[in-house]
């Protein structure tokens, strides 16, 4: 994120679900205590995965690459570690009651993330490299989530989302379940990002 450091107060390095609550709690606590922006940024920098550029001293080599990277305040980590959800069943925050717009949206469907990451490693795909390792969600939990989200939203289509949906090891099982379970409601199934 360093090329954009002058324009942002902080960056989150990793998958957002791991830090949302801690970051918002720190913000609310700082606001309630009457703390300054600097106070909040110092507290935020102590949350794993948060990079606050103003709290680091960075020097560059002649070619523009980073030569050194050091925190300027006590309590700020030497290295900002990328945060990942490793256990997609334990730590995944499934949004079972998504916002349903009052107008027809282009992507008017339930999105069910079946896995994160990709096994392919295609050189042209940044996401496939950035979101490693590949992590699957449990098929039984996916079935329950699909049932709940379709009932609560009234959508007539469900997208089985991932970087490469065809690589999900239980794809046949979840697709057959959706066909059988929602046959009477005529729910459509979308499979984006198929690699065959």
Predicted regions and their residues:
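N-terminal [4Fe-4S]-dependent radical SAM core
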Residues: 53, 59-111
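Conserved SAM/AdoMet-binding glycine-rich loop
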Residues: 147-196
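Conserved structural-core and active-site-/substrate-pathway-adjacent residues in large, well-folded domains
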Residues: 9, 50, 117-118, 122-125, ...
């Amino acid at each position: 994120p360093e090329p954009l450091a002058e324009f942002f107060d902080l960056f989150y390095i990793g998958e957002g679900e791991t830090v949302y609550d801690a970051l918002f709690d720190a913000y609310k606590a700082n606001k309630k205590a009457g703390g300054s922006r600097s106070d909040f940024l110092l507290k935020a920098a102590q949350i794993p995965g948060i990079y606050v550029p103003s709290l680091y001293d960075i020097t560059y080599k002649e070619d523009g690459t980073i030569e050194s990277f050091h925190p300027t305040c006590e309590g700020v980590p030497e290295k900002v570690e990328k945060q990942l959800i490793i256990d997609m069943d334990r730590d995944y925050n499934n949004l079972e009651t998504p916002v349903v717009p009052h107008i027809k949206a282009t992507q008017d469907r339930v999105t069910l993330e079946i896995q994160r990451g990709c096994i392919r490693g295609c050189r042209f795909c940044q996401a496939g490299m950035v979101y490693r390792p590949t992590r699957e969600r449990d098929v039984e939990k996916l079935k329950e989530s699909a049932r709940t989200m379709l009932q609560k939203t009234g959508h007539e289509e469900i997208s089985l989302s991932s970087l490469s949906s065809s690589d999900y090891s239980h794809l046949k099982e979840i697709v057959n379940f959706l066909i059988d379970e929602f046959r009477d409601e005529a729910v459509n199934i979308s499979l984006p990002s198929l690699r065959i």
